[in-house]
């Protein structure tokens, strides 16, 4: 009976290992399509548009035992290569720049967060929203 239990345990662990090695349970860092919002205080509408952003899982390590060392920096999914695109906000009064520029992810990588080009916060309870009335249905990549 003990040998049967050992064999069953070995079988379960080996099958579980094969299943787990097929790939990560979380999607890795990569470009994905996302809908964002653009507005200007001087313009009457908000535009939602679709672009490519970096999102996904980056492997990280956390110390299990307390140490006198500072915490290890945690990598984030951030831009590797990008280009900038622009959209024009309709209905802006004369003298107000109606153009809004935004990054388009071409490729992504796991690395330190650069506040100059990335939002390093965690997931949001609500997606980015507009204060002005929306003008939906535009698609830009």
UniProtKB/Swiss-Prot annotation:
Record-level Gene Ontology MF annotations: hormone activity
InterPro entries registered for this protein in UniProt: Cystine-knot_cytokine, Glyco_hormone_CN, Gonadotropin_bsu, Gonadotropin_bsu_CS
Gene Ontology process terms (BP): G protein-coupled receptor signaling pathway
Glycosylation positions in this chain: 33
UniProt keyword list: Disulfide bond, Glycoprotein, Hormone, Secreted, Signal
Cysteines joined through disulfide linkages: 29-77, 43-92, 46-130, 54-108, 58-110, 113-120
Stretch forming the signal peptide: 1-20
Keyword check for Signal: yes
A GO-annotated cellular component: cytoplasm
Presence of keyword Signal: yes
Pfam families: Cys_knot
Alphabetical list of CDD domains matching this protein: GHB_like
Entry's family note: Belongs to the glycoprotein hormones subunit beta family.
Function: Promotes spermatogenesis and ovulation by stimulating the testes and ovaries to synthesize steroids.
PANTHER family in the record: GLYCOPROTEIN HORMONE BETA CHAIN, LUTROPIN SUBUNIT BETA
Subunit relationships: Heterodimer of a common alpha chain and a unique beta chain which confers biological specificity to thyrotropin, lutropin, follitropin and gonadotropin.
Protein's UniProt name: Lutropin subunit beta
Upper lineage: Eukaryota, Metazoa, Chordata, Craniata, Vertebrata
Gene behind this protein: LHB1
């Amino acid at each position: 009976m003990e040998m049967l239990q050992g064999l069953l345990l070995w079988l379960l662990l080996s099958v579980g290992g094969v299943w787990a090695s097929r790939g990560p349970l979380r999607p890795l860092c990569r470009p994905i399509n996302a809908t964002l919002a653009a507005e200007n205080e001087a313009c009457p509408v908000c535009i939602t548009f679709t672009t490519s952003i970096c999102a996904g899982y980056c492997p990280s390590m956390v110390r299990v035992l307390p140490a006198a060392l500072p915490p290890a920096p945690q990598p984030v999914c951030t831009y590797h290569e990008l280009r900038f695109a622009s959209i024009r906000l309709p209905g802006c009064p004369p003298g107000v720049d109606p153009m809004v520029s935004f990054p388009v992810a071409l490729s992504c990588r796991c690395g330190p967060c650069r506040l100059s080009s990335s939002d390093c916060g965690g997931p949001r309870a609500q997606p980015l929203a507009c204060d002005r009335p929306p003008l939906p249905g535009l698609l830009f990549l």
